[in-house]
Amino acid sequence: MTPQPAKVQAISDTYELLRLAAARRQAVAAIYDGLPRLLCPHVLGRKSGQLHALFYQFGGSSRSGLPVGPEGMGDWRCLAVEKLSEVELRADAWHTEPRSRRQTCVDEIDFDVDAQPAEDPQ
């Protein structure tokens, strides 16, 4: 058996894919800290010079677990883009909840879903 190369994405490619997903209000699947996650990217930019994103995680795993609320399972997550791997667009429905407080995940905002008009589904 020939070993297969690991699926590697450049950080810039990952970031652009997340930006596209956010603009389309489309979910992504990814690996973060070795755990599979289903995420909806809401805010993208930099914190202390590093690329970060604020996601709503609605599925997959997490070391801290996912709470179950009235809308189902989910929670807000601030994740470093460089720690994401195997990021793929998904056909899952867009998931979100009102932000209970001002986000502090991203200092220099490049993209915020809440500041963009929703795309018209065709």
How would you name each of these model-derived features?
Residues 2-122:
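Core beta-strand-centered patch of the WYL/Sm-like small regulatory domain
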